[in-house]
From Swiss-Prot:
NCBIfam families linked: IF-2, small_GTP
Family statement drawn from the similarity comment of this UniProt entry: Belongs to the TRAFAC class translation factor GTPase superfamily. Classic translation factor GTPase family. IF-2 subfamily.
Organism: Xanthomonas oryzae pv. oryzae (strain PXO99A)
GO molecular function: GTP binding; GTPase activity; guanosine tetraphosphate binding; translation initiation factor activity
Protein name: Translation initiation factor IF-2
Region entry G3, spans: 458-461
Gene responsible for this protein: infB
UniProt keyword annotation of GTP-binding present: yes
Amino acid sequence: MSQQTTIRKLAELVNTPVDKLLVQLAEAGMKFSGPDQVVTSTEKMKLLGFLRRTHGKAETPAEAASEAAKKITLNRRKLQEVTVSAGRTKTTVNVEVRQKRTYVKSENEGSGRATPMTPDEERADILAKLAASRQRNLDEQQRLAESDRVRDEEIQRKRDEEQAAKDRAEAERKAAEEAAAAASAPAPVAAAPTPSAAAPAARAPSSPSSAPRPSRPGGASPASRPSTPARPDDRNNAAKHKTRGSHVMVAGVEDDDATKRFAGQLHLSAADRARRSNVRGKPTGRPGSSSSRRGNDNGRGSNQANSGPHGFERPTAPVVREVAIGETITVADLAQKLALKGGDVVKALFKMGVMATITQSIDHDTAALVTEELGHKAVRADNADFEDALLAHAEDAQGDTTTRPPVVTIMGHVDHGKTSLLDYIRRTKIASGEAGGITQHIGAYHVETDRGVISFLDTPGHAAFTSMRARGAKITDIVVLVVAADDGVMPQTKEAVAHAKAAGVPLIVAVNKIDKAGADPLRVKNELLAENVVAEDFGGDTQFIEVSAKVGTGVDTLLDAISLQAEVLELKAVAEGRASGTVIESSLDKGRGPVATVLVQQGALKRGDYLVCGIQYGRVRALFDETGHQPGSAGPSIPVQVLGLSGVPEAGDDFVVVDDERLAKDVAQQRETKRRESRLVASATNRMEDILAQMGKGEGQQVLNLVIKADVQGSVEALKQSLVALSNEDIRINVIHSGVGGITESDANSAAASKATIIGFNVRADASARKIVESNGVDLRYFSIIYDVIDQVKQVASGLLGVEIREEIMGIAQVRDVFRSSKFGAVAGCMIIEGVVKRSKPIRVLRDSVVVFEGELESLRRFKENVDEVRNGNECGIGVKAYNDVKAGDQIECFERIEVARTL
């Protein structure tokens, strides 16, 4: 180092704080006033030597060698065998003992003494050493005595505090018992002393501050024992065996009782005896108890039952619990929360008319009723922890709002030209691609016009797609109601008006097909007036635009009306951040997996985002628009197809983009659990209703089982609703399974097991499914138009109903007189007053409009000739088989039974 090294620089070089370095220099005998002073090389070496001496190291290699020469270490190893008894046998164990000794040569050894000490000097040296040793022993004894005194005082203080706490708890317990006894007693006894006055007197002797403790028979108390200084050897033994229980020795357990207690245990040390005495003979602190009277005789007094604050007390009143119940709960969980047996809860449910097992789930209302019936209070549990986290996650994504394109839904009756109108706007040929020329899916498109971007939703007009139209009206901004000028208002037109009003969405009426010869726009306005849709011409606020989807008349005016209505609504949304929206349609593509058509309502949906969609979740693998292109992102009011979900979501579910997959998975699993529990509760209720219905109706009702598979979720929903609605009191349509995608082997097995008919709507069965269908004779039918599905199911259901026997009255004959015949008995002379009477047909005899006989017409004669029939206005003789009580004035009704095929 340089000669001009300062203390600060030296501290940086040796990585030591400046203050510490100044202290070390001062200890080495070098005084410096500040860190900026210069340190010479000599001073550095002096500091280094001081530090080496301080840490016990030699300053130079020569000194280190000399230090090593003064030490010698000897290692000794000795082997021996030890015999150990293990049960009845003895085992020899080899034991190796290793010893290590280090000998250090003193400095003066070997060098000799220059002047040997005289005997007087040696004696003085020995006396000085003895005096120093004696003084050290006295100091150590005083220190130990002081520490023992402090420890004893601390132990006594803790005991006093524990005793006071026990006394307070005992007093409170007695006061509670006396209050309960006074409340249950019929009348207080005046001569009896009050417990509150007797309690302090009973507790007075036990208080350490009020009275001295009785001395033990074996010796004096710790307070009266003289404090004699302990011998050094005793102190050493006490220091060697110091344990947790040593304070009991100080408190005076070395008495006769202790000697008797540990008789035969002389191998125990004093500390071990004290610890065992502390554990076995701890006093209960209750004067007058059996343990206090007997003392600590053999430690048995501590086995008495402790009636302190930790003892069991029987409740004096029923315990009312507050039970948190979610949407669903199993009977076993409810019983656990009520602290009851599961059988008791099941019995209570049976008394309420609910048949449930201990593992079955019940809904919140049923659980709340049975909880209140059992005397407890039910509260609704908050199970929306993940939902709350998702809501907070979505609220954090709020940002600046910008103007967004309008979402326009095209609604109307079937075949009124909705898709054709949208086709003209988009300049494509969509209508020709739909089976039967009708729309069976929700088509979502966005169109760039001269007036900006407009997103269109084309909904089906068929009656089976009610839920699709309701879903379209829910997420839309403007509804364009298409009405054919030649047909006028139809049932689905009225339904579309109701959906628009329920959603609070403004309505624009497009009167289509005005180019046809029978078009009457005024008729449309008048018919819609009955539905409270008032045109602007009539003083209302609804725009009526006359258009022609075939030639394009009025389409530009319709777009202007849509843009004007959007400006009035001032539609805004957050264009950046995490996206959220609604699922319009979903399907299962064999090559791409689950595909969901979503409408973004907030934020921007990008590739790679994690999203929760109903009970499904996943990462967006790809985005597709209606033209098949892959946009980079989709903003508000833009419909896109999403790939990458874990399953097919339900149409109408909301989706939210989250930051991580963990939150998405947790939310989806919680929703799936809730939906499954609700479905189990509903299915159990339905099964019970089915059992009761079968008990009431017998075996008369037929059941038609169906398995429905379709290409998109909306079609599955529409088919289920339409087919189940065909059920009546004679036949029940039961959809045992429905789903999206092709017909698989499991679908075929389910249909074979339940003897169901498989309906494939725009889907086909794979090879394994076809093999099962052929081998088991399962009825498999393919459809592409929903009309055909409904008609075919009606025919199949009608075939299950069989035929109906109907009675048709053919003619009525009035009895004018009765004749006797040896061959036929009584023969009625009749006049045919209605219809035709034929031979060998069943008849009824009516007397005063009451049926008195039902049988068969045996003989029919006219002018003594047998005839097959007699018509109205003619006279005849009628012989009734096995009936002779015919009287004048009776009516004979002739009828026939015919079979009529039953239909739905």
